[in-house]
């Protein structure tokens, strides 16, 4: 327990109003004497003086008012009396002095004030602040007008009717008049003043709405928001769009173009929808060019937009491929596919010209055998040309599905051979549709922000993962295994796979070969639908996706997805069946497992396929 101090000691330890500098710094008890006892004990009595406290902020001298730092001043607005009405009156924010804040006669209700902001910090040249204040009553008479034309800067300025965010009523907001007045204010010689006029009219039951301006009649055609800032932003965006948008034909012109291209309404529905859309866009573009040339505007600004490549490292050269197909206005469906099949025969020579930097998987494995070799020879690794790979894949699929698939018109439709070839054509359309609808949108969203260094890192990751998978294949030596890229290019084939199929190793790895060359048509169609829907980027609801696949399976016998496939819980592997091509030209039914390997962007880079033959007993 603390010992009680005597009364004499309590008096000496009594707190004083101001301590000396030493006692204040050391936080010890000081006395009223100067020098104090603490300073005398330490032989610093000559330095003992009162601690000076910081003075509080007072009103600045020279008569400067702190209210002038708000950066707001009054600006004269000549408002004609005939335009001032209870329905179209503008509120003006005014800075009233304390002695003039209350007029001689206060209006009973419907007091409307027009306010104006001025964001200008230069007040040196402001000798006086003119002001015009209008107080309007129900009958529209002006109670107080031109109250003062000269207010000294030394008077106290108060803000009247100053909400933080003015409330804008949807029924009384007039965007057109608001921005017209703002445009006129910008044309005035007050170039140094930034004026933003805002209408804020309260709604009362006694308001007379008979005197409406012409702008109020069109008020219903404008888009209103409850926020003043939303209206400003909307109008600014609208002005930008109106200024920068080139001439576009209206709906009647588009419909007339459509009727001219397709006189028969049923012909447009039976034709290819993508071809119809391309022809329509080309026709619309030609009409725009004619309009622009007649008006006299140059279209060079808009033509340069087509030449800009926003994603230079990931692109699809679809316009150049479809340019020749769009030349004919009415090609039949079969004739178009036949022309594409014929053009694919001479496209291989063009692809080889762009394939000078290609290193076959077998040659690359001779250089890189360990992970250390991969990083030592990192200069040899370049981003894989997937654009060229998909072009070769399209050529391979055309040869597989369309080679010798011309349908003879003289043969009856009931012929089994012609029906089978028609199904093959339809299967190819299903494959392309699944790529465009299921795979491409997600892939583009994931790769939209990738740069060239990311693609290089992706290739290094692929090669590193490929080394691990090859080592695993050596350990699990009993399962035929094949590894390919997401584009289908084969990267590795195990010895058991060679023994099962009978193909030569040099045939598969010394050139660009696709896994789809060694599957039948039904297995290829199943692979693309399962890979694009479930395996490429994972899946959430397994049962829902499985039902979706079953429902979306087309009606042809060759394109139906087999019902005997299952999933893993992590979404990286699918078990199904396929028919594997043998060296003698026959197909072997196999149970297969497709496992996907993704990178850090969740983009599939490798697919590992394991095959086990199924021998059926007669």
Curated annotation (Swiss-Prot):
Question: Subcellular location, in the record's words?
Answer: Nucleus
Q: What sequence ranges are listed for the domain PAS?
A: 466-538
Biased composition annotated in UniProt, kind: Basic and acidic residues: 335-352
The question of whether Transcription regulation is a record keyword is answered with yes
Report the principal subcellular site. Answer: nucleus
Q: Which UniProt keywords apply?
A: DNA-binding, Metal-binding, Nucleus, Transcription, Transcription regulation, Zinc
Q: Which GO terms describe its cellular component?
A: nucleus
Q: Which PANTHER family match?
A: GLUCOSE STARVATION MODULATOR PROTEIN 1, ZN(II)2CYS6 TRANSCRIPTION FACTOR (EUROFUNG)-RELATED
Q: Which family does it belong to?
A: Belongs to the ERT1/acuK family.
Question: What is the official name of this protein in its record?
Answer: Glucose starvation modulator protein 1
